[in-house]
């Protein structure tokens, strides 16, 4: 069958977590798994960071479950709300609740994520897709992440 790459990136478009899921599955069910794998090592005796300041996501990640997860971990959700959810909320009137907080200025930084995915998909090792096993496909995605990080890091 088919596979799909899921990854979390930092503000520079560098992948922090890379996973491969089923191609026919949605993106939002993989989000809690991606977030649980997030580990950012820091220099010295500073503890490992597992909580980002904010998560920028598209409308596919605008679910109550994801927003509740982010709220429970004190992570700011910068996720646009789909029109159908806006309509359902307004149809319920005062019982529909307030719209979720949305920072349009921060959301403009989401293009970094899209450019990161574009770079992964344009890389010949993954674009040609000779790998038949999900394991080797993930290995290729991780190798591409290593290339990106090696270009970024200066010694």
Model-derived regions, located:
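Conserved, well-structured core segments
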Residues: 4-7, 17, 118, 135-144
């Amino acid at each position: 069958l088919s596979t799909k790459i899921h990854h979390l990136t930092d503000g520079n478009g560098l992948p922090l977590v890379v996973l491969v899921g089923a191609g026919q599955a949605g993106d939002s069910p993989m989000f809690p798994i991606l977030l649980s794998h997030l580990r950012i090592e820091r220099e010295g005796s500073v503890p490992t960071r597992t909580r980002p300041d904010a998560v920028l996501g598209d409308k596919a990640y605008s679910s109550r479950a994801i927003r509740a997860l982010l709220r429970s971990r004190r992570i700011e959700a910068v996720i646009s709300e789909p029109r159908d959810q806006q309509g359902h909320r307004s149809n319920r009137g005062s019982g529909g609740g307030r719209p979720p907080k949305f920072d349009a200025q921060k959301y403009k930084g989401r293009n970094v994520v899209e450019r990161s995915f574009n770079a992964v998909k344009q890389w010949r090792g993954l674009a040609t897709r000779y790998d038949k096993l999900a394991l080797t496909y993930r290995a290729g995605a991780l190798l591409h992440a290593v290339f990106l990080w090696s270009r970024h890091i200066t010694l």
